[in-house]
Amino acid sequence: MGKITDESPLILVTCSGVSNVGKLTAQAAGVLVQREPDLFEGHLHAKQSTRDMDAVINGGKVVVIDGCGDRCAAKKLKSLCITPHIHIIATEEGNKKNGMADPLFDEIETLIAAVRREIKQ
């Protein structure tokens, strides 16, 4: 996976599952799109239809945020033969998968920082 080397808008794809880390990915992506609309073109959930995802992505630069090692978002993109430019897994950033709890503000901010760090590398 390559890092982002130009100013092209990015598309976030998240697992958005029902667990706390799945919810965390969706909330972090929503905040990123809101705070930096010039950097992020949009946000897709892995549960969206493959036709919708393929049409929106259409060769764009993709940042995947998965909640855990199940890698649901990355698997969905793989089925479309799309390789993400960046792939982040929330549990590898120190977040614990613990059922259906709601994500905490500091967990959202930590995941946002990880996305920004990977984009700037």
Protein language model regions, located:
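Iron-sulfur-associated redox domains of electron-transfer enzymes in respiratory
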Residues: 1-121
